[in-house]
Amino acid sequence: MGTVKDQLILNVLKEEQTPHNKITVVGVGAVGMACAISILMKDLADELALVDVIEDKLKGEMMDLQHGSLFLKTPKIVSSKDYAVTANSKLVVITAGARQQEGESRLNLVQRNVNIFKFIIPNIVKYSPNCKLLVVSNPVDILTYVAWKLSGFPKNRVIGSGCNLDSARFRYLMGEKLGIHSSSCHGWILGEHGDSSVPVWSGVNVAGVSLKSLHPALGTDSDSEQWKDVHKQVVESAYEVIKLKGYTSWAIGLSVADLAESIMKNLRRVHPISTMIKGLYGINEDVFLSVPCILGQNGISDVVKVTLTTEEESRLKQSADTLWGIQKELQF
């Protein structure tokens, strides 16, 4: 008598078990796990790998997700602190790093997180040399540059989550103000993910109707409706959430899954994400900033050339200068 399995199943094919749509999430903190569950619930991967340095937490998070397998369509969920577990990933999401404290600027995290990246990036490259890297850790624009430098990857394959979330926050707040669902409220926030981000008021519209054409003072200091406060709220929102609950997680997780979907399904949707923008808007340094990018299976294939006002362009340039000032001091 064979085992129950032998009696039940006749094997007719010896299969090679290589994944075709594998995604890795590095870092299983609040952000990493929000990314993981959001990716799982969008059915984007046939294998999900989790990596972290805290082994008990890592195993616990993996088991907790595995126990939900019946309700998911991702047949393999694995984890290890050994990067061999990440082999053959199509997409690697990096959320590992020091967490922003209450009132702390994202830029303040930089050297701590650079040191962490020096260990992570070479390991990812070793096991998934053809993957796309999606950097989420803050300060995201600088760390995307760091990941690009450390990986040796072409710039199309190194992507920062950038202003995808800032723009989503903006569209939510705009929707609240107008009583319209955020998917029908269009507006782009570009530049640094953080305090010096730039709202492009000229492009803000509903159904193609420019709000600036209806209300020329939109976004200026002389605006009686104070639309500028909408952008101010976007900038302050992360700080407020951190103050209230200690960290942000759900919105960034959903934002990352949105980007992962465009990559894994080769959707070629346009997202405000961090890419190398040297040569645009009079920027001559290797700076990563958010501009609208076409995102698909090869990562960022194209950049949309946005018409900016003189003020918007100078604010973008200022953002770039701030970031370059920090980047050039970094110890690799």
From Swiss-Prot:
Disulphide bridges, residue numbers: none
Cross-link annotation Glycyl lysine isopeptide (Lys-Gly) (interchain with G-Cter in SUMO2), location: K57
Location relative to the cell: Cytoplasm
Residue sites binding NAD(+) per the record: 29-57, 99, 138
Entry-annotated residues carrying Phosphotyrosine: Y239
Modified residues annotated as N6-acetyllysine in this record: K5, K14, K57, K81, K118, K126, K232, K243
Catalytic activity: (S)-lactate + NAD(+) = pyruvate + NADH + H(+)
Enzyme class, spelled out: oxidoreductase
Pfam families associated with the record: Ldh_1_C, Ldh_1_N
GO molecular function annotations of the record: L-lactate dehydrogenase activity
Keywords tagged on the record: Acetylation, Cytoplasm, Isopeptide bond, NAD, Oxidoreductase, Phosphoprotein, Ubl conjugation
Superkingdom of origin: Eukaryota
Single GO cellular component term: mitochondrion
Post-translational modification, as annotated: ISGylated.
Sequence intervals crossing the membrane: none
Residue positions, PTM Phosphothreonine: T18, T309, T322
Annotated PANTHER family: L-2-HYDROXYCARBOXYLATE DEHYDROGENASE (NAD(P)(+)), L-LACTATE DEHYDROGENASE A CHAIN
Listed name of the protein: L-lactate dehydrogenase A chain
Origin species: Monodelphis domestica (Gray short-tailed opossum)
